[in-house]
Amino acid sequence: MIDVNFFDELRIGLATADDIRRWSKGEVKKPETINYRTLKPEKDGLFCERIFGPTRDWECACGKYKRVRYKGIICERCGVEVTKSKVRRERMGHIELAAPVTHIWYFKGVPSRLGYLLDLAPKDLERIIYFAANIITSVDDEARHADQTTLEAEMLLEKKDVEADMESEIAERAAKLEEDLAELEAAGAKADARNKVKKAAEKEMQHIRERAEREIDRLEEIWQTFIKLAPKQMIIDETIYEELVDRYEDYFTGGMGAEAIQTLIRNFDLDSEAEELREIINNGKGQKKMRALKRLKVVAAFQRSGNDPAGMVLDCIPVIPPELRPMVQLDGGRFATSDLNDLYRRVINRNNRLKRMIELGAPEIIVNNEKRMLQESVDALFDNGRRGRPVTGPGNRPLKSLSDLLKGKQGRFRQNLLGKRVDYSGRSVIIVGPQLKLHECGLPKLMALELFKPFVMKRLVENDYAQNIKSAKRMVERQRPEVWDVLEEAISEHPVMLNRAPTLHRLGIQAFEPKLVEGKAIQLHPLACEAFNADFDGDQMAVHLPLSAEAQAEARILMLASNNILSPASGKPLAMPRLDMVTGLYYLTMDKNENEIGGQGAYASATEEGPAQGVYSSYAEAIMARDRGVLGLQAKIKVRISHLRPPVDIEAEQFPEGWNKGDVWLADTTLGRIMFNELLPWNYPYLEGVMVRKGGGTGKIMLGDVINDLAATYPMITVAQTMDKMKDAGFYWATRSGVTITMSDVLVLPNKEEILDRYEAEARKIERKYWEQGALTERERYDRLVELWKDATDEVGNAVEKLYPDDNPIPMIVKSGAAGNMRQIWTLAGMKGMVVNSKGDYITRPIKTSFREGLSVLEYFNNSHGSRKGLADTALRTADSGYLTRRLVDVAQDVIVREDDCGTKQGIRVPVAVEVKDAEGNVTGYTGHSLIETSVAGRVAATAVKDAEGNVMVEPGENLTDQLIDELIAAGVKEVKVRSVLTCQTPTGVCAKCYGKSMATGKLVDIGEAVGIVAAQSIGEPGTQLTMRTFHQGGVGGDITGGLPRVQELFEARVPKNRAPIASVAGTVHLDDEGNFYTLTINPDDGSDVVVYEKLSKRQGLATVRVPMESNPGAMIERTLAEGDHVEVGDRLLRGPADPHDVLEVLGRRGVEQHLVDEVQDVYRAQGVAIHDKHIEIIIRQMLRRGTVIESGSTEFLPGTLVDLSEAKAANAEALANGGQPAELRSEIMGITKASLATESWLSAASFQETTRVLTDAAINKRSDKLIGLKENVIIGKLIPAGTGISRYRNISVKPTEAARNAAYSIPTYGDSIYGDDGYGEFTGASVPLDEAYDL
């Protein structure tokens, strides 16, 4: 077997018959498989041991040679080589065909490669191949020309003979008629009898003339056909072809079936054909030029690759190894076999029958029919169902052909090469493990024992519990007590990986240190749930064991849960307290008044009656007061604190030099808040406020912001420890808080009826206007009722909110952000409001009752529509989202950080600061742009950034940290030019500077990071949260696609529904009203020709524009585009989305990049999902990587082909250097599916979609896969060239330090090492920069 690490590229080409014979170990001659009595393979059959190798290791078929000592001997009795039975997985056979057959991929694929090569229409080709027509393969023009006069004379002579025969026949018949008439007259027959005889004779003579004319016409047709006969001419009429063969067979050759095609291919001159086609392309136009271009692609492919086109017609076919198409015996003595065996059997049967017929000299028609059947059986073997009805097996099931084995989710690529199952893995249900640390998981004892079995057995032998491995194995299987102690040792510091399907992003698989637990369920840390999207309602997780030291190191350093706190999509923390923990922390940090429970002992200033209350000298004293029951947890008190850092404002005021541990300050706080701050690192500024997960507001602190801040300023280990403390405190105080939900906590609004009566009256008025007065259209009635009842729901909801006291558990849960939202409380206690029907339109009767009161039957029925639609949508969305992720991964999988800096000066401009104006419109300061988090953060400056005075604030190439961005905002810098993957000049992949920082680590991205995969996961993972809805815009503009379908539409670069045309020039608008349409004319500002847009739909509506108010020119208003308005280049003229192809044409590459980023982000932001722009930019870079060649210049490119822009750049540079003409290209935007299939790697494209088409194309072009991306390396089993598998890390050998060497080579009885140091290099233990240490 070839070792995958010893080759760098993989090439695919066309196999000739000689190649197939060379691979083969023998010819399969019989259709038999195995003997059903002896169960041994039949000789020369499909499982023959002589051809494919022995079925048992080191044993020949007849049993003469057994054991390994006869290795390599070929038995003289049975002819079987003594070797391992594994060779039956790799040895091939072949079938010698009695007649050639065409390969269905090349004849039936779209486009038909055979058809393009030979310039034959696929229909004609099919007629020839399946023996329905003859084709002329060659004509001897010289001989024909030389003998033409003689042949013509012969033909004219034959014509004269025919005419002479006709004349004599007619004369004979006329003479006979005379006799007959004479006889009749003599007999005294009547006139009508004579006429009858006369007519019959005339009719006969007419027939004779017609027959002769037909004969002459046929002779003329045969002669004309012969004179004009040319190669590749098809003759459908069998009789004409036979006549031609009879008369002129010396002057031409022809035939039918694959044999004729083979002859044509052998006579085909690639070079002269390519020359002719290039001539047509240069001088021709229209359809002719297009056809020539398409044909040249195929001809040039054969020319360039050196493939022999004759490989498309097969003289022999390969038989794949028998272990890959096995036959197994079932219980009842029957056999289950792979479909391939049936298909091979059909081929062999028909082939043998054809051989026999040819030997017997059967009539041609029978032989041709048998040849056609052989062709069909080979077609079915290669690709069943591609042509005609598929061959079916038992139960009318189409048999799986060789093509079907590769295709689809169950095919070889996706099932066995990209998705292997692995050993050392298990799965079980998960339960919560609140006692665990963030980097730990609970592993059931039995599962751990099975997973770590080899490690345990090794240790048992090492520790002398067992004499050998066999007895150690027995001990493990019997679960002896000592095994458990050894297991504890084996699992310590050996991380395991947990995975929850679906693994939508890289945090769906993380490493943990196992802790042994009783029971059979895996225990998961509560904070890890968010990343896995796990809950404990029966979810299962898989456990995988990293075996090698390198794998363990990677799991511990890169994948440990405590090192993966931040989301790779947005850089926000994913491991955050949720649910109970949030409730607990909210309860702990609340503040209450003296008269509320938990508020006793609050601060009261000193009065004449007594000293101040609620003042404590230390945190310890406050704790003591609580233990005595005089101080509530949430009471506001004053405490002297010296062990925690003061809040920022107090520190600035009281400790201008900076605060040191031990410096005393006075906190105005609650005991609970001190307890919370105790959880944070001691030098983190004190937080005074109530902790919430979402919602924010005055006096509230977002937990996410705190963790973000911690992650940015402290090492990961500190962050992980802090979060564990938060988790413990959250659970502890959630338990103590007694927050529960019961029916009595749901308070019902007393005055709901009054509110609803008011709205009911309004609704009646609207209904009356529609039904009785006809003053409203159906649409207006609908819109008004929807609006009315939405207002009603809001009013009832807001009233309900005011009804609840702060200490009611329901608002506590909602306000803390632990679960639910206010809308759900409205539904529980107020009213459900409007619901949708199954089409997604609102039902105009609202649900007026709350769930607490209970719904009426009609309300329940109305509500069930929407609920079911919701569930159906969710299911569809999950599937669609998964497919989108798969396409995104495929298009971006080879985008890896390849180098540190590509050295480009280019970049994109992103907004930073926005002016803050007062009522008069004066600028009072600056604030950060709303999109700063997802556009500027984590980038590298492309050029120097200067403030208003011209001082350089940021140097080119400097990272834009949060601190720098704050400084830029303060200085009022409105936009900066940053490096972006869109402008990166690295040919394959991207450079670290253009990518910026990795969102998951907060540091500049490492070389080798698979940023393309991260980008695809970051976009695909939130896909399930996006809606499936199509929004209805009240009558105008039709439906607006939103949510997931919109994202797909953008990434596939489809023309959107109701697309809006865009202005190609800047100028003034002139509108003409033409019934249902507008005609819009733009008068350009530069005075060039006017641009006219016709047939603009009124129904779609004109676009909205922002214009200054007449009364207050400082303010802007939105209104519909009108006569005399000014439009800029790229402005939309109608409502609806713009077509990306139009945007590319009008605004160029940068314009379409910006358009796509903005549009995709709009969809995600609408759902509250934060994704950094750089992820979307990576996908867009892949969509815009190629261009169409318009003029090829002096390059090798063909006009009309898609080429990689970096490839074209290199080719143009070479052409210019040699004094030639560069190629002209037009930028193209390709959808992600098309871009994936156009990738350089044929392995990656074939495993994605349209497997057979990709492989057909790759084989003709003899494509070579350079194994640059991840997918192709996974398929062939190499380490992926990303992360730690990148080449610069591959050749590193680790050298021990002095201390380590002494420890390794010391002998206990002697003090010193007996090895001298001169045998070693200098090991100082210092790390060596990789690039200097090795020439990489």
From Swiss-Prot:
Zn(2+) 2 binds at residues 902, 984, 991, 994. SUPFAM superfamilies: beta and beta-prime subunits of DNA dependent RNA-polymerase. It catalyses: RNA(n) + a ribonucleoside 5'-triphosphate = RNA(n+1) + diphosphate. Binds 1 Mg(2+) ion per subunit. Binds 2 Zn(2+) ions per subunit. GO terms for molecular function: DNA binding; DNA-directed RNA polymerase activity; magnesium ion binding; zinc ion binding. Its EC number is 2.7.7.6. Zn(2+) 1 binds at residues 60, 62, 75, 78. The keyword Magnesium applies. Its cofactor is Mg(2+); Zn(2+). Belongs to the RNA polymerase beta' chain family. The RNAP catalytic core consists of 2 alpha, 1 beta, 1 beta' and 1 omega subunit. When a sigma factor is associated with the core the holoenzyme is formed, which can initiate transcription. This is DNA-directed RNA polymerase subunit beta'. The gene is rpoC.
